[in-house]
Structure formats: structure tokens, C-alpha cells
A protein has these predicted regions:
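Generic hydrophobic secondary-structure signal
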Residues: 3, 7, 39-46, 58-60, ...
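Cap/insert and terminal regions of metallo-dependent hydrolase folds
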Residues: 66, 74-171
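A short helix-to-beta-strand connector/capping loop
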Residues: 14-24, 36-39, 159-162
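Core dinuclear metal-dependent hydrolase active-site scaffold
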Residues: 24-86, 169-174
């Protein structure tokens, strides 16, 4: 809802609305939206910086498979949902992997750039069975994230734990 108002009230986006180039449709957290006959989304509000709009992830439901898409979140423990439970309910989980660990951000205050570190996520997900760990793909990696490099210790650790780092150009059937 806040994003709808922001776009409609601020140029250059408001021009698209005024000229009817786009039609804004409000979506609401946890209310399923049918996009086509066999594809729907469920927005999931997540705690993250909300200067201009609410931040949401999505559960995406296709004709055969489903996915969880959470590219931005402050920390898993701040969410009123169980990320563990959500992972077990989908076929793929595309999750915030912005930063690998605190060393990557040097002396910056993590509260200014909040994201779960991949090493925190690895610890949180370690009790998932192999099938559920293998559903997880870290996405949204910052350019400084060592997991971007397949030869790095960071990348190899993620893979050794049974999780994945998403690769550009990959396709996932829904």
C-alpha cells in the first residue's frame, strides 16, 4: 500500500500512472494473488528498511512446484514467521545472502545495512534434513561477498553443508 501511494505521488513514476501506462494494484501480506490460471503469489511482509514502502518476500505457487523468495530481511529472528517451517513447505527457497559475515562489512554498523549473514543462516539451517537444506539458494549477494567466487572457502563451505549459491542464468521449473 505505501509503494502504491509513493509511485502515484512521485515523478517520474506518477507520469506512468497519470498517462495510464501502468495500473497500480495493491497487494496485501498473506493474501494470495492469482497472476494466471496456474501461477499465484502470496506476499509475506518481512522486517527490513521501510523508508518508502513495506518490504515483502513472496511464496510463489506454480502448477507443479513452489518457491519462497526472500531477498531482503533484517535478521531471521526478527520475523514473526518461522523460516525453517516455510522452507519445509516449498520446493525452492531463494534467500537473502547479501553478506557472508561481519568481516565483509568491516567496521560498518550492521543496523544501517541489516541482513542475516550467510554464516548465521548456515547455523540456523544446520538441523534441516539434507532434502530441505538442498532447497536453499542464497541470492542477492553483495559484490564484496566471497561466496560469489566458486573457488572461495565461503562458497565451498556453503556447498559442503548441502546448500546452494544461486547462479546467474539458472532456471527453476514451477
Amino acid at each position: 500500500p505505501k509503494m502504491t501511494e509513493f509511485i502515484a505521488s512521485n515523478g517520474p513514476w506518477s507520469q506512468l500512472v497519470d498517462q495510464k501506462n501502468v495500473e497500480l494494484k495493491k497487494i496485501f501480506s498473506e493474501k494470495e494473488e492469482k497472476l494466471t490460471n496456474d501461477l499465484s503469489i502470496i506476499p509475506l511482509r518481512v522486517p527490513h528498511r521501510d523508508e518508502y514502502s513495506e518490504t515483502v518476500g513472496f511464496k510463489i505457487i506454480g502448477p507443479k512446484k513452489s518457491a519462497l523468495f526472500i531477498p531482503d530481511i533484517d535478521k531471521w529472528g526478527k520475523w514473526d514467521k518461522s523460516i525453517i517451517k516455510l522452507i519445509t513447505q516449498v520446493d525452492y527457497a531463494f534467500l537473502d545472502g547479501t553478506f557472508y559475515d561481519a568481516q565483509e562489512i568491516n567496521n560498518r554498523d550492521i543496523s544501517e545495512i541489516p541482513h542475516p549473514f550467510i554464516i548465521e543462516s548456515l547455523k540456523l539451517f544446520e538441523d534441516l534434513n539434507k532434502l530441505n537444506r538442498n532447497k536453499i539458494y542464497f541470492i542477492h549477494l553483495n559484490h564484496t561477498n566471497p561466496a560469489n567466487n566458486k573457488k572461495s572457502k565461503a562458497y565451498k563451505l556453503i556447498i559442503s553443508k548441502g546448500l546452494n549459491v544461486a547462479q546467474e542464468g539458472s532456471n527453476f521449473e514451477l
